[in-house]
Amino acid sequence: MSNMMKALVKSKPEVGLWMENVPVPEVGPNDVLIRVRKSAICGTDVHIWNWDQWAQKTIPVPMVVGHEFSGEIAEIGSAVTRYHVGERVSGEGHIVCGKCRNCRAGRGHLCRNTLGVGVNRPGSFGEFVCIPESNVVAIPEDISDEIAAIFDPFGNAVHTALSFDLVGEDVLVTGAGPIGIMGALVAKRSGARKVVITDINPHRLALARKLGIDHVVDASSENLADVMKSIGMTEGFDVGLEMSGAAPAFRDMIDKMNNGGKIAILGIAPAGFEIDWNKVIFKMLNLKGIYGREMFETWYKMIAFVQGGLDLAPIITHRIGIDEFRDGFEAMRSGNSGKVVMDWM
């Protein structure tokens, strides 16, 4: 195996990524080197491409980015015992310290010292990626490489949706991006009574309809209260999944929640936006922030969903070779795409 590889690198502090030849990551005793087959583009990667304020404060330059992937094991460290060369895998993109109070209590997703693959350390937009053995997840043979490559965002959706009991509940999802749509699918499959999803992007609304979400609402032209009445809802929503990061959508969600309703919040909203806290108080709402995936309970659950028949393939709207990466990022930046999966083989 050559000691050099192709990779997409944030090599300059400006807009874009660049395909370069870089050294293959070194494998430590507890590490696993994975030959990447498929990579998916995340909204985080778009922020890095755009070199916005968050990226400028967060991303070291130069660095290989990307964190959504699937592949096969190319090499294992001397202390690795659970995996073997050739095994099909994906990986948890949050690397935790294992030493803080939350880690020691089995709550790794709450680690205060989390390092993000492709954010704080070299990522998966390359022919190889190296992660600790503890972050590797084996992929069953009946799950394809492209579906395994979107397990990271699917895990966000599963973690958010399953934060509260959904059986028999009326669920509002704000934001029909890929994670929002997947969250709505999980809610529907988990026994929710009514599932309503809102957005203002026509492409995303059409994608939500294509994937079988029962009630898809264009918030730019439809009144949510009227929709609720038309589908037989006489009270507010029991569970809200806030996926949009849009202040108007969040405020509308709070308005439409039933007393005692529960809201799981994944969307990252603008700093300093206002909500009516009196409504939160007098409705006795339960707000819960969500970040990443529970390690590794969420992974077990999402594998079970897919093996149980949940079809995520339609959420992938663009399948391209890695040399077409610019087209993939343009599709993501336009907002007129679902997931974009790039092929490294």
From Swiss-Prot:
Binding positions for NAD(+) per the UniProt entry: I179, D199, R204, L266, G267, I268, I290, Y291
Location, primary (coarse class): cytoplasm
Record note on cofactor: Binds 2 Zn(2+) ions per subunit.
Active site per UniProt: T44, H47
Subcellular location: Cytoplasm
Keywords annotated in UniProt: Cytoplasm, Metal-binding, NAD, Oxidoreductase, Zinc
Keyword set includes Protein transport: no
Chemical reaction(s) catalysed: L-threonine + NAD(+) = (2S)-2-amino-3-oxobutanoate + NADH + H(+)
Binding positions for Zn(2+) 2 per the UniProt entry: C97, C100, C103, C111
Gene Ontology cellular component annotations, sorted alphabetically: cytoplasm
GO molecular function: L-threonine 3-dehydrogenase activity; zinc ion binding
GO BP term, example: L-threonine catabolic process to glycine
Pathway: Amino-acid degradation; L-threonine degradation via oxydo-reductase pathway; glycine from L-threonine: step 1/2
Listed cofactors: Zn(2+)
Pfam families: ADH_N (PF08240), ADH_zinc_N (PF00107)
Record carries keyword Repressor: no
Binding site for Zn(2+) 1: C42, H67, E68
Subunit structure: Homotetramer.
Functional summary from the UniProt entry: Catalyzes the NAD(+)-dependent oxidation of L-threonine to 2-amino-3-ketobutyrate.
Family the entry assigns: Belongs to the zinc-containing alcohol dehydrogenase family.
The protein's name: L-threonine 3-dehydrogenase
Species, as recorded: Rhizobium leguminosarum bv. trifolii (strain WSM2304)
Gene transcribed to yield this protein: tdh
